[in-house]
Amino acid sequence: MRTCIAAFAWFLLCGVSWAQDSPKGQSEPTSVTVPAAIDHNRVVINAEVQVPDGSTERVHVWVDNGNPELSMSRRLATLLGLAVSCTDHECSSPSPREINVGGMKIPLGGVKEAKIPLKPVNAASVLAAGMDAEINLPSSILRHYDVLVDFPGHRFSIGAPGTIRFRGPSGKVQINPENGLIQVPSQIEKKKYNLALDLGASISFLSEELFAKLATAHPDSPRMTGAVGSANMWGLDEEPKWKLMRVDRVQYGPIFLANVALVEFPKDRMEFFEKRAGMPTAGLLGSNALLNYRVGLDYAHSTVYFEIGRMFNFPDFDVIGLILRPEDDGRFTILGVAELEGMPSVPPGPDGVQTGDHLVAVDGIPAAGSTMGQVWAMLGGTPGQERRLMIERGGRQFAVAARIQHFLAELPDERDRQKKK
């Protein structure tokens, strides 16, 4: 747990990067590879921006290929001298001219406007609560490049079309020409669907209709209510009620994925998602399903690549059963507790955990100021292990002992099923 947190902190502090195809004294590289932090299954890299006085500032960038909109924090917009205008709900500014990733300039001018979340003054540096990033790199920018996300190696590569050598099984995909969003031809139970490829999402989603159909057809499939672990995306009010299920097998383009954890996509969000995709879709596959792969995006040829990088699957749902909301001030509010076998998985009540409490620390490690990925690393481990949660309620702090549970148990493999028969 501490090793994971320390590794992320090291990445943020050192900002090491290396460029390809650019020996000293020569022109700007045509492709670069830089270290990436995989935090709550999201890809975060270091980049530099030039401020008005000519100096440069290092910023953390969220690689967000499932979103066409450019977003940044108000602090960054102000630092760059951009004019910010606000409504009652959000702010915006002209897009920055460019960012520099590992020595390679990535122009952002193709996106006319950058969205800025409406935050209090003391949260001006917050792009999204629970993340340490101040700007994203959206699909509308990425679509002009070759892109490679190496999850096992914690690396990110970007280059001009034709400069990255992709490996692994490949398949043709549909790309929205207006915004770069990707739909991958897929099959579930021999029926064809489109599923988006969204490496900016920590968890995967299925349409309400398809989710219900699979749940009815497979009543013994592992399922639960409550967005714990990687399903705890942003701490939305409805996350304690989200339905989760493991799907036995998904053919995703050229590869087959087993025991895929998926969330039921609320109907209103699904309608917006499908409209933005510009074509029929049954949901999306997030990074949680692809952490063992090096995922290559060849936008110029409408092709994706999946090279296996490791075989071990990390138990992303062996966690303390809390549903959390990261706040703009760095604190974490408890939205709810997931049940296990019909009982609360964390002690409830006056001496336990209640909705609205704040998670102060886990085993003495402060939660405030951490990312979602760091906090869930604290809350994860081996089922049965005990964690000491420091809880705050009404200005009073007290400890609650909670055990790590094995949520959403994986389906048995085919050999086990045959033995049972």
Residue ranges: model-predicted function:
Residues 19-421:
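Pepsin/retropepsin-fold aspartyl endopeptidases
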Residues 1-4:
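Positively charged n-region of N-terminal signal peptides that target proteins for export
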Residues 6-15:
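Bacterial N-terminal signal peptides
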